[in-house]
Amino acid sequence: MQLLRLIVPKRATTGGMARIAYVRVAIVDVGANTLRLLVATREEGRLVALREQRVQLSLGEDIEHSGTIGKEKLAEAAAIAGAHVRRARKLGCDRIDILVTSPGRQAANGRELVSRLAETTRVPTRVLMPEEEG
């Protein structure tokens, strides 16, 4: 849930009146071991998880062995992220973001991973800094 706080403002103001900016949001968390979908909504000022799904991919194994993510795993990561984004859209998410953790920072081809995910899914994609991971 902490990752969701990176994309969900507590409140937005319009014309002096406070309103909630997004009703339902999703994060695709691309980590060293899994690609996780987390869908949440804001209820009474707090985030409530509606769905969480993980798919094991082990990008970190490739990075550990060769310093890069292999072409097959790049393609598989893009396919899994695409499936997560489609699922989030079916669940009515107002905002979807992809947040890449250590694979984006540690792999020699981390930028290629981020580009591939963004091109495949057409949603905002970025690498988190270690201090943002919490």
Predicted regions mapped to residue ranges:
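Nucleotide/phosphate-binding catalytic cleft detector across ATP-hydrolyzing
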Residues: 2-32, 38-134
